[in-house]
Amino acid sequence: MNKLRFLISLHGNQNDFQVAQAQCAEATARKLGINAEIVLAEDDPVNQSTQLLKAIQSQKESRPNAIVLEPVGGTALPQVAKAANAAGIGWAVLNRHPEYLAELRRQGRVPVFAVSADHEEIGRIQGRQFAALLPRGGSVLYIEGPTRSSSAQKRTAGMQETIPSNIQVSMLKGNWTAESATRAVSSWLKLSTSRSAQIALVAAQDDAMAMGARQAFQQVADDQERARWLSLPFTGCDGQPASGQVWVRDKLLAATIYLPLLTGIAMEILVAAIRDGTQPQEHSCTTPVSVPALDALVAQRS
């Protein structure tokens, strides 16, 4: 069999999880002995669609055997998926479980499946972290991912399942990047309501946004006010060994949630499916883990 060629389509390189996803894809390609081309959509769903269609519509000898896609927009590019399927290109979706997968799988030509983090459970863990860090209750400033993101919506829903009634949450919107969170928090700080909010914890749906929030508070002009904000616990999510876990050890974050990288998992499933001529399980989830463990957080605050 000729060396397999995979196209890996990711959001961009503006947060640590996306960078780690790309690095994981490169390492997995070396391990599996396949070629992997990584393309970055620069957080633009139209750009992502155009990049993928160009590859799908290229000469047969230069087409990828499979595409691994982490969708930027609210949909997982159903028309592009159909074009890939018609061209005999495998299709793996990361962090979504789109409805169109079942239809494409019934056609049975190539592997079609999804691998995602368990976003509801991520949210539930965040809610439990809040309870551990604020045993007497209080107010949380919570930075969500973009409105279009089902991952963000599910994390929020999970968090709301597990926070106790003595914790109130004020929500801001970010775009998974440090810069977006810095802008959101800086704008919020200009509102009179920010001064009366009595925030006791700052949380974000990823580590990059949590660190971006810290950056906004570092820019507060008043020394006493700045020190008060920076003394609060900050929590995030992604928990990669080279970023989020380091920030926890350095006490820049009080907690994060470790998420296994998805690109390598999807690539391994694709290689096995292509070589064995099988159709993988339609959807599988990875397991998130609190860092530090929840009982350790409780012990820190008791």
Describe the residue ranges of each PLM region.
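Flexible loop/hinge segments that line or gate small-molecule binding clefts
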Residues: 79-121, 241-246
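Hydrophobic alpha-helical
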Residues: 69-87, 159, 170, 174-246
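Extracytoplasmic "Venus flytrap"
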Residues: 5-24, 28, 36-53, 70-75, ...
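Short beta-strand elements in bilobed, periplasmic/extracellular small-molecule ligand-binding domains
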Residues: 30-45, 139-142, 160-182, 231-232
